[in-house]
Design a protein with these regions (language model features):
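Acidic, small-residue rich beta-repeat scaffolds with periodic aromatic anchors
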Residues: 22-29, 244-267, 348-439
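Positively charged n-region of N-terminal signal peptides that target proteins for export
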Residues: 1-5
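Hydrophobic residues embedded in beta-strands of well-ordered beta-sheets
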Residues: 98, 121, 152-154, 175-179, ...
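Acidic/hydrophobic-patterned starts of short beta strands in beta-sheet-rich repeat architectures
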Residues: 280-293, 332-346, 392-406
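Bacterial N-terminal signal peptides
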Residues: 7-15
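Terminal domain-start segments
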Residues: 244-319, 425-439
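Structural preference for beta-rich elements and adjacent junctions enriched in aromatics
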Residues: 21-261
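Repeated scaffold domains used in trafficking and secretory/extracellular systems
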Residues: 273-276, 321-329, 380-388
Length: 439
């Protein structure tokens, strides 16, 4: 009987002990701030030989940069690993377009026709200049995989603004899909191609469609918020550095070296550093280069004569003093045609004096045309005196004036190649101004 009582007590004791169930872990959610910014020093390519056509052999020599950080959705539920969803991107740029290759691993590429929503990729872009100033607003290009899943072509659509300036081609393969995209700079604002940058971000939106309660999983190449991608700050976007200015000039030097007969006549043999200005001479979408060194002027650009890079060189008859010249691009007479002004010092051949001389050129009808030259001032090399002239250019005439403070004791200055130069007004001439023909 005693044993029975003890057994009953033990049974009651055991029934009163409760074991706590293990706490269910909350799935980790995607966080845009976990993603690093991916920058590129993109290679330059020839637009005439590069197209968004689905032929990815163009990208064979260029590295893809991978990204797989979850921006939205839950790990282990909406995203199970890189094979479920991960991405990679590469960038090239040409004179008129920028190119993106986007490669996505996705174990289920879906269309909204099947059930809920299509898989999509968004490419967000904003150009900026060399000082980091925006050259246009933020634009998003939506690439819808749905039509491609259903047997058609990928749909490329700007999320705002005009629907032009972008081309996309994609194909679905084993374990994912590939997309080639080309975007014209003029679809984004002013071109940054010479020495600026393209800010970019790739956002990949994924739906597996195996659960009605699933959330969208999204990954990105920058810390972008999938719920409000337009809120991305420019400094948080990836930066593609562009430098067509240097690429153009190096190409010109390389070609000139191969074709120049005399080594000392090559552009690369210039004794003085090349001064290079970026400007618009030919009125084409891509800016041009104006370069000067010693006595040689070079004008280069795409669309100057044909669609390829072309350049034109011209040598002055007189040598400079060795001091750096100044390049100005201006419309001197208001006719809306840009002139090129080269200003430099030249030594007088008859007296120990130095003249500051300007040369005017215009590029027109696929040729560089010399317009005129004139002396701005003449200085005694010992600093004892100076004479100055000023010039005002209008559509009707050129007005030349003598600075009243000019030294009266100085003699004239003879320069090489001065036969077609405006005659300098001397204090001894007795004239204070002259009216000359217009340029």
């Amino acid at each position: 009987m005693r044993g029975l009582v003890c057994a009953i007590c033990l049974s009651l004791l055991c029934s009163s002990v409760a074991f706590a169930a293990p706490k269910k872990e909350t799935p980790k959610k995607g966080n845009p701030n976990d993603q690093a910014v991916l920058d590129f020093d993109a290679p330059f390519v020839d637009d005439s030989n590069t197209k968004a056509d689905g032929d990815i052999t163009d990208w064979g020599n260029y590295k893809l940069t991978e990204f797989s950080t979850l921006m939205s959705g839950e790990y282990d539920y909406d995203w199970t690993g890189p094979k479920d969803l991960s991405g990679a991107v590469s960038v090239m740029y040409g004179a008129e377009k920028i190119y993106f290759y986007i490669k996505v691993k996705d174990n289920a590429v879906v269309s909204k026709k099947k059930r809920w929503k299509s898989d999509k990729v968004e490419l967000w872009l904003m150009p900026e200049d060399e000082n980091g100033k925006a050259l246009g607003g933020l634009r998003g290009l939506q690439l819808d995989l749905g039509p491609m899943v259903d047997g058609g072509a990928i749909s490329a659509k700007w999320l705002s603004g005009k629907q032009s300036g972008a081309t996309a081609v994609g194909f679905i393969g084993d374990g994912g899909y590939d997309i080639e995209v080309s975007v014209n700079y003029d679809a984004l604002g002013k071109t940054p191609v010479m020495n600026g940058a393209m800010r970019y971000c790739v956002l990949v939106r994924d739906w597996d469609q195996d659960d009605a309660n699933e959330d969208e999983a999204a990954i990105g190449s920058c810390p972008i918020n999938p719920k409000n991608p337009k809120s991305i700050k420019r400094e948080k976007m990836g930066k593609v550095s562009l430098n067509l200015k240097d690429a153009m000039w190096q190409y010109i030097l390389d070609v000139d070296k191969r074709h120049s007969l005399a080594p000392d006549k090559r552009l690369s043999a210039a004794k003085e550093p090349w001064q290079i200005e970026v400007t618009d001479i030919g009125g084409t979408p891509t800016p041009d280069l104006v370069a000067f060194s010693g006595d040689t002027l070079v004008i280069a650009g795409y669309g100057l004569g044909n669609d390829q890079l072309a350049w034109f060189s011209l040598s002055l008859e007189s040598p400079g003093s060795g001091a750096p010249a100044k390049i100005d691009i201006l419309d001197i007479n208001g006719d809306k045609k840009p002139e090129i002004r080269i200003t430099r010092d030249e030594h007088c051949t008859n007296n120990p004096m130095t003249a500051n001389r300007s040369y005017l050129f215009r590029f027109e009808n696929n040729a560089t045309h010399y317009l005129a030259s004139y002396i701005n001032e003449i200085r005694m090399d010992n600093g004892d005196g100076v004479m100055k002239n000023t010039y005002t250019f209008t559509k009707q005439a050129t007005i030349q004036k003598l600075d009243p403070k000019s030294s009266k004791e100085m003699g004239g200055c003879q320069l090489n190649g001065s036969s077609d130069m405006f005659e300098f007004l001397m204090p001894s001439d007795g004239e204070k101004s002259r009216t000359l023909p217009h340029i």
